[in-house]
Swiss-Prot record:
Superkingdom of the source species: Bacteria
Catalytic function, reaction form: cytidine + H2O + H(+) = uridine + NH4(+); 2'-deoxycytidine + H2O + H(+) = 2'-deoxyuridine + NH4(+)
InterPro entries on file: APOBEC/CMP_deaminase_Zn-bd, CMP_dCMP_dom, Cyd/dCyd_deaminase_Zn-bd, Cyt/Deoxycyt_deaminase, Cytidine_deaminase-like, Cytidine_deaminase_bacteria
Protein's recorded name: Cytidine deaminase
Species, as recorded: Shewanella sp. (strain W3-18-1)
Domain CMP/dCMP-type deaminase: 47-167, 186-296
């Protein structure tokens, strides 16, 4: 079991903890598939809803909040039945807008894993307005069920009445809907090819600034992030922040980063290079490789 879970595992009911420990191996990064979840539910003699709430301390253990020191864990349940953990991330000494909220982390985890719809969000603190707006961008977002400890479950529409969302800006394919943009780039670099694929899967209906970041660590592992825009603009999730959230979920340190690549469309209304460099230079002595590509 990873050291970061030693304290949080003691907060779980013993039968659930015993069943969960084998999953918390060195490569565990917060994903539990539907079959594993069913086994946890059976072994613990709890309902699935009870298990998901009980797992929140494990999700919160993924957090990296050096500024607030407030650990928030979230779990996104996909339509597939799989669950995806996420946690808040703050960059030391950097502006607060670089922060990643736990709900964003969990949703991006699900998106990067191929989920096309989120049906439930479980979180240990009431979603802030920023996160409510972020969730409203999702496929059938208004009907996502929000679960909080010791509170009744409600749909997102309950938490965000009279919402402004993608439909108000004539966007018919919301975040997580299957869509892809093709780009032209001649490269044999596996890291750049990976970034190009993720840029094509990014979500930028408001600026057309499709983009992705790939981070490579000293052992050759790569961690990707995609741009995820929002109808309200400010709650948009930048690809560097998504990549850093991905990296920390995998229990890697910022000091492990040896290479960073940003790929973005030449036809976008904005560029993410400045914000991406700001975040990168805060946490790693690595120069950003910036590649601009043309859509097909």
């Amino acid at each position: 079991m990873q050291d970061r879970f030693i304290r949080s595992i003691t907060q779980l009911p013993l039968p659930l903890a015993d069943a969960l420990i084998p999953l918390l191996h060195q490569n565990f990064a917060g994903h539990i598939d539907a079959m594993q979840l069913a086994k946890l539910t059976l072994a613990s003699k709890m309902t699935e809803a009870e298990v998901l709430l009980a797992l929140l301390p494990i999700a919160a253990a993924l957090a990296k909040p050096p500024i607030s020191e407030f650990y928030v864990g979230a779990i996104a349940k996909g339509k597939s039945g799989d669950i995806y953990m996420g946690a808040n991330l703050e960059l030391p000494g950097e502006a607060l807008f670089h922060s990643v909220h736990a709900e964003q982390s969990a949703i991006s985890h699900a998106w990067l894993s191929g989920e096309s719809q989120i049906v439930d969000i479980i979180v240990n603190a009431s979603p802030c307005g920023h996160c409510r707006q972020f969730m409203n961008e999702l496929v059938d977002g208004a009907n996502i069920t929000i679960h909080l400890p010791a509170q009744e479950s409600h749909s997102l529409a309950y938490y965000l009445p009279y919402a402004f969302g993608p439909k108000d800006l004539n966007v018919v394919s919301p975040l997580l809907a299957k869509q892809q943009t093709e780009f032209v780039l001649d490269s044999s670099d596996p890291m750049i090819i990976e970034g190009l694929d993720h840029a094509g899967l990014s979500y930028a209906p408001y600026t057309q600034s499709f983009a992705a970041v790939v981070l490579e660590t000293h052992d050759g592992a790569t961690y990707c992030g995609r741009y995820a825009e929002n109808a309200a603009f400010n709650p948009s999730m930048l690809p560097m922040q998504m990549a850093l959230s991905n990296l920390t979920r995998h229990n890697r340190e910022f000091s492990d980063i040896r290479r960073a690549v940003l790929i973005e469309s030449s036809q976008g209304k904005i560029s993410l290079v400045g914000a991406t460099m700001d975040a990168l230079h805060t946490i790693a002595a690595v120069e950003l490789e910036h590649i601009v590509v043309d859509p097909v």
